[in-house]
Amino acid sequence: MLRAALPALLLPLLGLAAAAVADCPSSTWIQFQDSCYIFLQEAIKVESIEDVRNQCTDHGADMISIHNEEENAFILDTLKKQWKGPDDILLGMFYDTDDASFKWFDNSNMTFDKWTDQDDDEDLVDTCAFLHIKTGEWKKGNCEVSSVEGTLCKTAIPYKRKYLSDNHILISALVIASTVILTVLGAIIWFLYKKHSDSRFTTVFSTAPQSPYNEDCVLVVGEENEYPVQFD
């Protein structure tokens, strides 16, 4: 009974410890550096890139933005091995005609790019960007897409979760330490219980009544009485 009750006691503590260190919204998200990523594999028909973006905002995120070579490589590797995405992924980028530059939908700074070609003379109105999975390069394309085979979303880890206060760290440490202590204590109690049970079982048999005769003594039965005969 003790062994059966112990997991039920430890599970809430383990859940609390896991919640204390979890950074992404759920296990379906993947963390890299200070952000969480999810690939929505559902193919949808859209009228504009805003319809694609709504897929991400419905999950509390925005379309993907990429800010360094390491992040670009992480996305490529995860798309190939885990997400199994299409050959081209629509990036969360648009061309702003007001200042003639590309910008991210999530309002982050454009600190990195990986364009496969640069043509200053091309018309960039209604131009979006796509990540080519095989090469890892970006290419320009029309924003007026009719359908997408999957949407890649990204959200930043909240500041208050990324930099836990000292109290939260202490609570997490205490929860984990308590879990370990209870596990060890439960194992010790179970061991002592089993040892006590085995000892009592042995004592019962060791105190059972013994025959008053030894191996050299036989019982001779007469016609009227019984008496032991001892052989020398």
UniProtKB/Swiss-Prot annotation:
GO biological process: phagocytosis
Glycan-bearing residues: 109
Alphabetized Gene3D superfamilies for the sequence: Mannose-Binding Protein A, subunit A (3.10.100.10)
Domain C-type lectin, chain residue ranges per copy: 32-152
One GO CC term on file: microvillus
Cystine pairs: 128-143
Coiled-coil segments on the chain, per record: none
UniProt-annotated location(s): Membrane; Cell projection, Filopodium; Cytoplasm, Cell cortex; Cell projection, Microvillus
PTM note: May be heterogeneously N-glycosylated in some cell types.
Listed GO MF terms: carbohydrate binding; signaling receptor activity
Record topological domains on the Extracellular side: 23-168
Role: Potential multifunctional C-type lectin receptor that may play roles in endocytosis and phagocytosis as well as in cell adhesion and migration.
Name of the protein: CD302 antigen
Gene: CD302
